[in-house]
């Protein structure tokens, strides 16, 4: 866990990663606006928080904590079948790998439960580390980052409303001369 946190702290000093973290914060603000059923525009997004209970960062933290608990419960009962340390390590890896699926599933369900019951004290305690960890992986975005996140969300909402199936392969990359041109193409533009 300390290695993961240290890695995030280290890369967060890089200017490009700081910008990525600003987009991450903008994504959260956009989702907060959408969940509040407010207009998807910068003025409504700006005051929202950059922390979100269903963040992937929180999910990673929940999955790590869940894996620690599961492995602490399961691995002591695994007999040592090989005398060689290397062979035993491989054997433990073979046992741990299939456990990753239920660990990920349990972490996902814990996060869903947290999102459905955000006012419950136990749930708040469960998600508190993830919410704190988001302080490392999000930064306060500027208006340009908010515009991009809101445009992406508007396009996503529009696509879901259209239920038009898969995106055509020839339309997978579109180039626009400016952000205003992108915004003008979006049906839900503010």
Show where each model-derived region lies.
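Polar-ligand-bearing catalytic/cofactor-coordination segments
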Residues: 1, 5-59, 113-118, 122-190
């Amino acid at each position: 866990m300390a290695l993961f946190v240290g890695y995030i702290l280290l890369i967060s000093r890089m200017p490009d990663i700081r910008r990525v973290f600003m987009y991450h914060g903008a994504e959260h603000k956009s989702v907060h606006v959408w969940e509040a059923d407010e207009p998807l525009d910068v003025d409504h997004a700006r005051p929202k928080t950059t922390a979100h209970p269903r963040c992937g960062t929180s999910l990673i933290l929940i999955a790590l904590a869940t894996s620690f608990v599961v492995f602490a419960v399961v691995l002591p009962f695994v007999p040592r079948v090989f005398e060689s340390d290397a062979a035993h390590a491989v054997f433990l890896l073979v046992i741990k790998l299939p456990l990753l699926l239920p660990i990920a599933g349990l972490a996902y369900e814990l996060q869903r439960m947290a999102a459905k019951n955000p006012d419950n004290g136990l749930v708040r305690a469960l998600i508190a580390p993830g919410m704190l960890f988001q302080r490392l992986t999000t930064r306060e975005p500027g208006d340009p980052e908010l515009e991009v996140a809101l445009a992406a969300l508007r396009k996503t909402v529009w696509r879901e409303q259209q239920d038009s199936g898969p995106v055509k392969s020839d339309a997978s990359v579109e180039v626009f001369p400016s952000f205003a041109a992108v915004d003008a193409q979006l049906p839900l533009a503010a």
